[in-house]
């Protein structure tokens, strides 16, 4: 069970920064 929680946490640690950077890039592209 602990390994599953750690895996889910690792996925969120990766997806959250990627999602934020992607959103910023989309806003910049739309701004131009």
UniProtKB/Swiss-Prot annotation:
Coiled-coil residues: none
GO MF annotation terms: electron transfer activity
Keyword hit for Nucleus: no
One GO CC term on file: plasma membrane-derived thylakoid membrane
Assigned keywords, A-Z: Electron transport, Membrane, Photosynthesis, Thylakoid, Transmembrane, Transmembrane helix, Transport
Membrane topology: Single-pass membrane protein
Positions of transmembrane segments: 5-25
Domain of life: Bacteria
Classification via InterPro entries: PetM_cyt_b6/f_cplx_su7 (IPR012595)
Location in the cell: Cellular thylakoid membrane
GO BP term, pick one: photosynthesis
Entry-linked Pfam families: PetM
Record-stated family: Belongs to the PetM family.
Subunit text: The 4 large subunits of the cytochrome b6-f complex are cytochrome b6, subunit IV (17 kDa polypeptide, PetD), cytochrome f and the Rieske protein, while the 4 small subunits are PetG, PetL, PetM and PetN. The complex functions as a dimer.
Function comment: Component of the cytochrome b6-f complex, which mediates electron transfer between photosystem II (PSII) and photosystem I (PSI), cyclic electron flow around PSI, and state transitions.
Protein name in UniProt: Cytochrome b6-f complex subunit 7
């Amino acid at each position: 069970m602990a390994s599953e929680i750690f895996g889910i946490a690792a996925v969120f640690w990766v997806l959250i920064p990627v999602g934020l950077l992607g959103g910023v890039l989309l806003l910049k592209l739309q701004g131009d």
